[in-house]
Amino acid sequence: MLTAILPVLLQQVSSLAPLHTPISAAFVAPTVTTVRVGLAPISLDGRLNEPDWMLVQPVTDLRQVDPDEGAVVSESTEVRILYDADAVYVGARLFDREPGKIIRRLARRDASTHSDEFTVYIDSYHDHRTAVRFSVNPAGVKGDQLEGADGEFSDKSWDPVWEAATTVDSLGWTAEIRIPITQLRFSSALEQVWGVRFEREIRRKNEVALFPFVPKTERGLASRFGHLEGLARLGTPRHLELLPYALARGNYHKPEDAADPFNPASSYYASGGLDLKY
């Protein structure tokens, strides 16, 4: 039911920090353009080989906050955003001249893996105060959280329904993300502008690069996002997602009577169900 309380939670946490965090006069929010697709669905396989990905210019100007603050990201990076009637798609081509050194550890959802990682932040309210964060590492480990009060508050207990697929190849690695419209909150305007930010971590270099770039000396998060333009006719989401699951379990115990056919030493159980979020 966490998705249902998202609007209330974000409004509450917005009051935890000063209403206005000073923004550097040098900061000008860059524009990211997206387009609507729909003739053929995006296949979430982590390969970015659908022609639709070429419909938009990639974001490439990520700059380091560590270790060389302000320098261009050391490995070329291209990020694109598409959307359709059901979801927002983020595709990232993360080039690496030494793909064999890409760090990709497995872990549970929301765990810190100390791996390479790609992250997208979205301020779908475009209030410059609140955002949602989606991250994935090359092994496909996902993370997500709410961001409030312009970066003063975060909540990892938020677990929306979304998907990600990754691939490591001779050029580096790719991340393909699908975020259902139902998991985001936005206005009813026909045409919209959202806030967006991209982040790449190259773990072996202790490197973190951002778009848009914000110096470490400046506070704030959503107030420093770029502007995502091109969104139109999103409609009113139904705020409902069903996530099927299956469970299996096996037991072994010492029976009281080994000859009793109705009391076997082993037993197996299976069940299934749906996680409902609205």
Q: Which role fits each region the language model picked out?
A:
Residues L2, Q11-Y278:
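Structural preference for beta-rich elements and adjacent junctions enriched in aromatics
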